Structures are given as C-alpha cells and as structure tokens.
C-alpha cells in the first residue's frame, strides 16, 4: 500500500454569515483562490500534476451546486484535472481528505487536492427548499433532528451545564484571538481581496 502524506495546507479567513466581509464571495471563487495560492506555495508542484480535486460541501445547491468541484477545478487548475463533491454534512471537508488519502493508498492517484468550501451567506443551512421524506417525517421524525436540538439532547444525556458550555466557548475564542495576535495562523490563512460597490446619490463607491 502506498503511503499518503499531507504536504501543505491553506485556508481562507472565517467569515460571518449574512453580514461578514465574505458575504458576497461565491464559495467556488473562494476555493479557487485558495487552491491557486496552494499550488504556488508547494515547490515543484504544477497544476497538471494534480490527479483529482475533492471538495466537501454540506448543502450542494444554488451557488454551491452544479458539481461545484469541477468548476473550482476549471477556475484554478488545468482543465484536464477532474473534481467531485462529497457531502457528509459538517464532516464533509474532513471526509474529502480521507477519500484523497484512500485514493493515494490504493494507487489510483499520486496527488490530490482535498478540502471543503461553504457559504452560509449565500445558501441557508437547510437549503432553499427542504423536501423531507414523508414516511420518515411521520414514523421517525428524530432522523431529521437539527444540530440545535441535538446539542440540547447531548447536554441532558451527559449533564453538560450551560455555564460549562459558555466557559468552553469563551476560552476557545480567547485562544483563537491570542493565536491570531501571535501570528500562529499566518502560514495557513490566505487573505481574500474583496471589493464592494455601493451607489450613493448616483455615484459609485468602491470599498476594498
């Protein structure tokens, strides 16, 4: 079995749904920007060496639909490089990396780019039209349990207090802020250039 190695990793900054700086950036453009920079960062790597592109996405519709991975490939790599989308909800990006590893282990690929992209500004959490299975809805509605209710059930089952959750969240954010201030993430976060055009009194104004 061939060994698989992660030789480089890169990501965009994290945005804020509906009102963050990346709210108007398409997820395919976001991923393409990162991939182009990633390929440049790896010494000796050329786009044509990539055997496959695997993209994780939890809601593959609208701006994230139409086999998005293929279009990301066309935007960032030679047209000969294929791509496909994998959906395992919140674990989609990680599953993409697992599949890349499996392809290399099996000998069906030598070089794979894998990760995930998502815009919760452009595509809502449950998509634009949920069409749930009637039999499941009637007989096993818990199969469609959302993450919020899942959290409530876990809190009850494992006796997790609200204060404990809030403290964990606070400490997590504090660690992230400290890491950013100490430039710990500088090598893995690639900045995204964003331009917004607004019209005020008939005059166009550009904000970058």
Q: Which residues does each PLM region occupy?
A:
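N-terminal extracellular/periplasmic Venus flytrap/periplasmic-binding protein-like
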Residues: 11-13, 24, 28-33, 44, ...
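Short, well-ordered amphipathic alpha-helical segments that serve as non-catalytic structural scaffolds
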Residues: 27-42, 68-72, 96, 147-154, ...
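Active-site-proximal alpha-helical scaffold in enzymes
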Residues: 69, 88-117, 155-185
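Flexible glycine-/small-residue-enriched beta->alpha junction loops
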Residues: 106-158
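Conserved catalytic cysteine-centered active-site region
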Residues: 57-110, 142-152
């Amino acid at each position: 079995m061939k060994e698989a190695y992660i030789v480089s990793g890169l990501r965009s900054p994290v945005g804020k749904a509906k009102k963050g700086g990346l709210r108007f950036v398409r997820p395919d453009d976001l991923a393409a920007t990162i991939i182009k920079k990633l390929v440049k960062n790896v010494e000796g790597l050329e786009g044509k060496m990539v055997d496959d592109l695997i993209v994780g996405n939890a809601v593959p519709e609208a701006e994230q639909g139409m086999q998005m991975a293929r279009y990301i490939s066309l935007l960032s790599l030679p047209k000969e490089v294929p791509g496909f989308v994998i959906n395992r909800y919140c674990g989609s990006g990680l599953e993409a990396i697992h599949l890349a590893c499996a392809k290399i282990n099996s000998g069906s690929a030598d070089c794979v780019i894998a990760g995930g992209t998502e815009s919760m500004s452009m595509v809502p959490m449950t998509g634009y039209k949920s069409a749930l299975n009637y039999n499941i809805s009637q007989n096993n509605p818990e199969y469609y349990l959302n993450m919020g209710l899942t959290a409530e059930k876990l809190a009850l089952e494992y006796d997790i207090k609200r204060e404990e959750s809030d403290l964990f969240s606070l400490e997590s954010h504090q660690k992230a802020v400290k890491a950013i201030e100490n430039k710990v993430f500088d090598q893995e976060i690639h900045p995204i250039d964003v331009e917004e055009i607004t019209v005020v009194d008939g005059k166009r104004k550009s904000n970058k």
